[in-house]
């Protein structure tokens, strides 16, 4: 089945009020003609209000967020609930990013709880999975990805991946300038889809699987030419309007 591509920008810990306003103004101009690709941006949560205001009057670019908590309210200092994100019209919520897994010791099981919280709230989880360089060199890529996916399936069932997104981000390629070759990325994406298909072909067929890890305006077109790469989760290049727009346009063209 034809899957509509999704390109999402993860701003990480970058930006300011002025930066948010300026970048979104530039993106609105650059992406004004886009009709064949879904687009989302995830600024730091402090700038969601600024971003929501800046995005008013257009429907091409959707808001997302970089994190969510499993609790809905209460004594959880520094956390963000699904309801808070919904108030700013955030739709696509990143969970399981390797930086959260590494720096905040988030386990597969904890990430599964975040996934459940998002599904309950009607938000779209963008589940990041991927292996370290050591795991890659040891031939454990499929094993690691399967484990991270199975944490969701074992807790919520494979149907939880309906209207959800998986972002395959090999940790050795994030922010390093290294990127998996299109063939390498496609092989992992095909494995991910087949792993889901073993439980449900219908769920696998509709699942958006993004690639992340040093995606830029130079390598995007070749990555998107692969049949199981349905878009990208973009880091550094999402902070530059022209580069991010080129990635979106490459996805639209490749999947037309």
Curated annotation (Swiss-Prot):
Its EC number is 5.3.1.1. InterPro entries: Aldolase_TIM, TIM_sf, TrioseP_Isoase_bac/euk, Triosephosphate_isomerase, Triosephosphate_isomerase_AS. It comes from the Bacteria. Pathway: Carbohydrate biosynthesis; gluconeogenesis; Carbohydrate degradation; glycolysis; D-glyceraldehyde 3-phosphate from glycerone phosphate: step 1/1. Substrate binds at residues 10-12, 175, 214, 235-236. GO terms for cellular component: cytosol. Keywords: Cytoplasm, Gluconeogenesis, Glycolysis, Isomerase. The active site is at residues 97, 169. One of its GO terms (biological process) is glyceraldehyde-3-phosphate biosynthetic process. Its main location: cytoplasm. One of its GO terms (molecular function) is triose-phosphate isomerase activity. CDD domains: TIM. Homodimer. Involved in the gluconeogenesis. Catalyzes stereospecifically the conversion of dihydroxyacetone phosphate (DHAP) to D-glyceraldehyde-3-phosphate (G3P). This is Triosephosphate isomerase. It comes from Haemophilus ducreyi (strain 35000HP / ATCC 700724).
